[in-house]
């Protein structure tokens, strides 16, 4: 495409882009994803005839642009990964022992595949690589036109005689540590298979030859080989388009156009940095590979040779600026990738593994829509927020000061500590399973409020009035007048009420001898405590009237060891003066 090629030439010449310096280089390749034709080549800057072509000859480590090709693509294809698949971003090692870290030196914990790939976390990428059979990874990558070998005996094994590097796959490939390297044209060709629905088409610049002498025309065509399922291609497109639209685009975002992209960085080792006299953390290669439903674009940015005067810092802004200039010449398109019948979109409940469907009462902020290969989507409904079961065996008996209600209740297994311990022992939660367990317990106790029982009275209109909440399996109900009261006990969280049980009702018949006019008293403590001498503060008493806390306006007296006190502070003083022994308050 002459107009696109002219635009790339303007970018490289400096006519339409201001470069960081005169030495920094770039290689650019743009292909048509539907027929494999090379649309434009940016061979480099300040070139003369015969110079090195940075788009087609420069073999460079691809950094994180390798992750869709070596990790998540094979995972979608062979291991039924979904965009929801969970990975624990935690301290991790390669199989042979060395530690692997993330670019920012931190860990994000449990994240989805969508998040892991979008923000380019290294540890989930390695974990994905480790989960897929290596032979399948080699098959997938070779199918995209990138030559990697399973073993030194493989027919396609090759070795660079100049530096000893080879194309033998290993775990470093998961984050782009390819010793042999790739060119921008290689990457544009590979990513095109995602864009076109799963077909590899070898890139080519010649479509036909016309012989002047004879007038004969020879047409050239290349094979269009199905190299991955359409579900794999769509899932990758969905994630990488999400990355672009949420800020992780490497300069590839074009407003009003459908774009998917992945960035990549290859860092120099600390030893190399020291040897060259450049800052630790310096970068060798910067990449952005982007594509639309029509074009695939690969940009490499860096120096021919790194030395103390020519090196990249950690910032990708200069490369991103080049990519923005390049994308101005890539035709916009509002065409989107149509979801194939082999993929289904499903709303799942967050933090479930395996993925489960939300219940009717799952909070909205705990729901997320993700994409699955058809037939692998979740079908089981999560019980985490499901409606709580009703109390059973609800009884009433007259006692001193009221009518004692008692009941039985079985906590659902999903809320039991032993169940949660087993749940969080799954390998996906990794070495932090204990902290995830404690976090869930804290959430249940603090955010949801802990499970207890709401006590309700049904009024004449049939509506319910909540008069108390207790964590005990009993409650002393004091009627407000004589006659029959309809009391309902519901299992519920103290704060989160959406999934409260339907409620179990009992009729309490009062002869009028016990009337409260709405006043109810409940102890905050109600337990036997062993406390150190002179270091105790009592919880006191709570008084409610028609469900409202009236403790501060109530006249409450406390008695301990035969003495009466009118305030909690006086009670605390008295308790702390007691000799060692057993007392009742």
Segments (PLM) and residue ranges:
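Periplasmic/cell-envelope proteins involved in peptidoglycan metabolism and beta-lactam response
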Residues: 1-60, 65, 141, 395-398, ...
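A penicillin-recognizing enzyme superfamily signal
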Residues: 2-18, 28-30, 41, 47-58, ...
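Active-site SXXK
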Residues: 8, 36, 59-87, 116, ...
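Conserved catalytic neighborhood of penicillin-recognizing serine enzymes
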Residues: 80-137, 170, 200, 212-242
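Mid-domain, small-residue-enriched loop/turn segments at the edges of structured enzyme/sensor domains
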Residues: 98-101, 133-189
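Soluble, non-transmembrane domains of envelope/secretory-pathway proteins that act on or interact
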Residues: 259-518
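Solvent-exposed, low-complexity, repeat-rich "mucin-like" stalks and linkers
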Residues: 517-548
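Serine/threonine-rich, repeat-prone extracellular segments and beta-strand-based repeat modules
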Residues: 548-585
